[in-house]
Design a protein with these regions (language model features):
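Condensing-enzyme catalytic core mediating Claisen C-C bond formation in acyl metabolism
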Residues: 1-26, 127-130, 153
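Conserved catalytic cysteine-centered active-site region
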Residues: 2-4, 54-112, 116-143
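Short, well-ordered amphipathic alpha-helical segments that serve as non-catalytic structural scaffolds
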Residues: 26-40, 65, 93, 144-151
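Phosphate/pyrophosphate-binding loops at sites that engage ATP/ADP/AMP, CoA/4′-phosphopantetheine
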Residues: 34-47, 156
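Residues at alpha-helix termini
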Residues: 38-39, 72, 103, 153
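Short glycine-rich phosphate-binding loop at a beta-alpha junction
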Residues: 48-53
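Conserved small/polar residues in nucleotide/adenosyl-binding loops
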Residues: 154-161
Length: 163
């Protein structure tokens, strides 16, 4: 069986700001897709499948947004796969898209990883509910800090490095 190679043909990003009130979730994603397609010299007709990577749904306050955004992503009538790995979702989306090409199943796959966290309360979304943990409401930084410190305690070469 011949090995199929996978490559990134183009990229597209949107403006990084605290809030984009000028566009919807679909509009934000479409901006990035249009830029990626232009960068690659491709059109939606060239795309065989779409892989969408997005963190947990409660960050935007909408369940399964990839379904109502299918038209904006050029995925109508094409295979649409959702990747959900939270903090590593961007990298995981690329891996899934590359795997689909390398398998020989599809020739061109559009990989889209996105978040528009200004749509909901990200601090609430990152806080694990009681009774599973203490109600600190500290978000990702506050949640992971004790884990990082514990890792440093066991892996740092000297006591000075552990503080």
């Amino acid at each position: 069986m011949a090995e199929h190679l996978a490559a990134v043909l183009g990229t597209g990003q949107t403006k990084y700001v605290a809030k984009r009130t000028d566009v919807s979730m679909s509009g934000l994603v479409r901006e990035a897709i249009d830029r990626a397609l232009a960068d690659s010299g491709s059109t939606f007709d060239d795309i065989d499948a779409v892989v969408v990577g997005k963190a947990p749904d409660f960050f935007e306050g909408v369940m399964m947004p990839e379904l109502f955004m299918a038209d904006a992503m050029g995925a109508t009538g094409k295979p649409l796969i959702r990747v959900h790995t939270a903090g590593s979702v961007g990298g995981s989306t690329g891996v899934v898209a590359a795997s689909l090409v390398k398998s020989g199943k599809y020739r061109r796959v559009l990989a889209v990883a996105w978040e528009k966290q200004s749509e909901s309360n990200a601090m609430w979304a990152l806080s694990i509910p009681v009774p599973f943990t203490k109600p600190v409401g500290a978000g990702a930084g506050g949640y992971f800090a004790p884990h990082v410190r514990a890792c440093l305690l066991y892996t740092s070469p000297s006591p000075r490095d552990r503080s």
